[in-house]
Amino acid sequence: MQSAILGFGMSIPSLRIKTEEIANTWKQDANAMINGLGVTEKTVPDAGEDTFTLAFEAGRQAIEIADIQSSQVSAVFVGSESHPYAVKPTSGMVAAALECDPFCHCADLEFACKAGTAAIQIVDSMIRAKQISHGLAIGADCAQAKPGDALEYTAAAGAAAFIMGPATAKNALCRIDQTLSFTTDTPDFWRANGKAHPEHAGRFTGEPAYFHHVREATKGILEIGSIKPEEIDHVIFHMPNAKFPSRVAKEFGFTKEQMEHGFIVPTVGNTYSACSPLGLAHVLQQAKKDDRILLVSYGSGAGSDAFLMTMMKDGVKLAPDTRETTYVNYTEYQSLIAAH
């Protein structure tokens, strides 16, 4: 039995900081940073927002779109590298807050920026095995970066959630056709226990890390799916910046039109575990029945999860976010980040 996405949701903070503001603070060339990264601004979590609150809001919306009772959900997996507690599961908090079935499989997942897609794979497997009828997979993060580090320009906050169930369900929106993972031991990015900020290996994060893993996962999923790039309608690659996914897409022959709906990084930033899942959530609003979707995540350390999906009906528009976008200065930004 195949699984499908029945509903989806997302939560993105309304606060932003512009790339120019960060660059000016550190006396760097703002235009060079914008052109180099392809990111003009990023989300900033407010004082009352964290990985749990973002995950909860996205999950609540996903249940609403799926048009099911939260008590039907018997598995909740939350992928993140910024869980609020070192010991106290975000997944259990989310399951309780959403009033899911208390006989619920719950776990917090970590694999850098691909923990959210790992959650999707686990729920997909449980549904295929007929162990559960409905599960909730969430990717959520309030990403950290050392002040003055290159990561500060992109490390952002957000969450995406997916209610999954049998592909035979009347409310099935998008079927999961195939999935695979490609994993190695590649030390491109890490945060040691007890450390406040992650470290990274600079340019090493590119070719032997992101590009190698995303290429291999993409080649593998296209091969097992017996599908060519031109037969894909929508493609989402992990977006640590705008340049990396654009480059790998060009290598495979994907067009800007195939990427446009899920390419959110220029004005959102890299939301880590929520990054490619948020791209998918945007695509699920625009895609049409029978459209084919390719999703490839990347998590440092390192690995990529790849998915082929098929839309079973036209996409569903989420309610518009009516909050006003507010831009903060660097001092305000650092104060908010310190609160997390």
Question: Can you annotate each of these PLM segments?
Answer:
Residues 1-48, 149-208, 212, 216-219, ...:
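Condensing-enzyme catalytic core mediating Claisen C-C bond formation in acyl metabolism
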Residues 52, 56, 82-83, 101, ...:
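Claisen-condensing/thiolase-fold acyl-transfer catalytic domains that form or cleave C-C bonds
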Residues 9, 79, 135-141, 164, ...:
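Short beta-strand segments
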Residues 21-28, 53, 82-93:
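A structural motif shared across PLP-dependent enzymes of the aminotransferase-like
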Residues 66, 70-92, 96, 102-104:
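Membrane helical hairpin/interfacial module
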Residues 58-74, 215-233, 252, 287:
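Phosphate/pyrophosphate-binding loops at sites that engage ATP/ADP/AMP, CoA/4′-phosphopantetheine
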